[in-house]
Amino acid sequence: MEFDPAKINTSSIDHVTILQYIDEPNDIRLTVCIIRNINNITYYINITKINTHLANQFRAWKKRIAGRDYITNLSRDTGIQQSKLTETIRNCQKNRNIYGLYIHYNLVINVVIDWITDVIVQSILRGLVNWYIANNTYTPNNTTTISELDIIKILDKYEDVYRVSKEKECGICYEVVYSKRLENDRYFGLLDSCNHIFCITCINIWHKTRRETGASDNCPICRTRFRNITMSKFYKLVN
């Protein structure tokens, strides 16, 4: 059975997008709740609403060696702290349609989806997630800087921090971060120890090289030791 975008109903509550896939002739109803994180432009998917057993399976899996290793590598590759790869919305009257455990979409597509025994539901879930991301991802021309209009579409209140961010250069490659050729490189890698500016690609390469050589994780400029790298669309974290 092929995924059919025409069968998707969308709605939203606060900052959560609700996708309902309804295929009555085949008795299929699937609800997927997605949070789009503003700072690093990534997606968190509610696995509780997909199947209540998935959340318990995930909590057990992440305690095992394979789970711990996967999450460690994902945190390193994305620049997102391990504790921020999951989010929880608590069950209450206001949140009854969106409560549950939300996890980074990479964990859903590459791990959790394999725990679903119904191959049709697997296929539809994959289609829903890919459809949502494809329709909610900004794709500015690779030869130009990211446009101010794209950022303003995220949230108007970020206009001031964007205005500063668009002038910032990476302290390693000395390129303006928003002017880098590839879209995936147009993110900042924020250190928890200082305010020096780096693009996410350069600081991740620096971090990986230091680890491989057994050196400590120090800022390339001030040499202050850091513990975490946070991937962000802006030069500093914003609430």
UniProtKB/Swiss-Prot annotation:
Residues 21-131 form the KilA-N domain. GO terms for molecular function: acid-amino acid ligase activity; ubiquitin protein ligase activity; zinc ion binding. One of its GO terms (cellular component) is host cell cytoplasm. Its EC number is 2.3.2.27. One of its GO terms (biological process) is protein polyubiquitination. PROSITE patterns: KILA_N, ZF_RING_1, ZF_RING_2. It comes from the Viruses. It catalyses: S-ubiquitinyl-[E2 ubiquitin-conjugating enzyme]-L-cysteine + [acceptor protein]-L-lysine = [E2 ubiquitin-conjugating enzyme]-L-cysteine + N(6)-ubiquitinyl-[acceptor protein]-L-lysine. It is found in: Host cytoplasm. It is an enzyme of class 2 (transferase). The vaccinia strains LC16m0 and LC16m8 encode a full-length E3 ubiquitin ligase p28 unlike the majority of the vaccinia strains. Belongs to the orthopoxvirus OPG021 family. This is Host range factor p28. It comes from Vaccinia virus (strain LC16m8). The gene is OPG021.
